[in-house]
């Protein structure tokens, strides 16, 4: 250790020491907080098999690439799970992994029945979920039904709260980690509701994948104790 607090000596040496000691190394302050966030609030996964749920091909491909970069596995889904998903997914979607729903027939299924089916899959350990519920889209339905002003705000706030609660309870119910990512921005109302309930949501799928890898490493090292 140098007088500045930096590690002195070959970096590979410290990697080896950390590995033997069971230390999960964070390579930046951002990673330190990301890893602490998921390790402190999510169930320990049984393995490194990730299923990705997304509403569109782009976010799904980005997440799949990110998982590949950090050594996570994307398993095929069982026939039973595929049969569960089929009623919810339009012909334009895909029920492979990543599960690309291309918007579901009922948008609210995205936050309830679909993630439940994926977490019930025996061949997966972790759900990585693209999270999107823009305010302008959600407001359209109550406005179309004749609600105005404060009534619209009340309706949208209730919907955000209900769907966020539906997502937040899944890790405890199924004993599997659920991690989110979004390209919309963490300041959006729905994302804030998720964060308030302890759901980790990242602005970059690679950060999500690295956080998942930290969870997997922790699980592996716990098994060796």
Locate predicted features:
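Catalytic-core regions of core metabolic enzymes
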Residues: 1-225
């Amino acid at each position: 250790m140098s007088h500045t607090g930096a590690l002195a000596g070959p970096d590979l040496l410290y990697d080896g020491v950390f590995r033997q000691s069971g230390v999960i190394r964070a390579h930046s302050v951002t990673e330190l907080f990301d890893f602490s966030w998921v390790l402190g609030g999510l169930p320990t996964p049984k393995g490194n098999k990730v299923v990705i749920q997304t509403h569109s091909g782009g976010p799904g491909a980005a997440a799949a690439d990110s998982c590949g970069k950090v050594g996570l596995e994307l398993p095929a889904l069982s026939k039973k799970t595929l049969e569960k998903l089929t009623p919810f997914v339009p012909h334009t979607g895909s029920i492979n992994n990543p599960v690309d729903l291309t918007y579901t027939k009922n948008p609210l299924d995205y936050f309830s029945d679909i993630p439940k089916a994926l977490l019930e899959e025996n061949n997966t350990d972790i759900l990585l979920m693209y999270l999107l519920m823009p305010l302008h889209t959600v407001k359209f339905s109550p406005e179309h039904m004749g609600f105005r002003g404060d009534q619209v705000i009340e309706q949208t706030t209730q919907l955000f709260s209900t769907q966020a609660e539906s997502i937040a309870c899944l890790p405890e119910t199924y004993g599997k980690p659920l991690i989110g990512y979004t390209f919309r921005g963490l300041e959006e109302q729905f994302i804030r509701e998720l964060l308030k309930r302890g759901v980790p949501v990242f602005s970059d799928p690679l950060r999500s994948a690295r956080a998942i890898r930290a969870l997997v490493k922790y699980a592996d090292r716990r098994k060796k104790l």
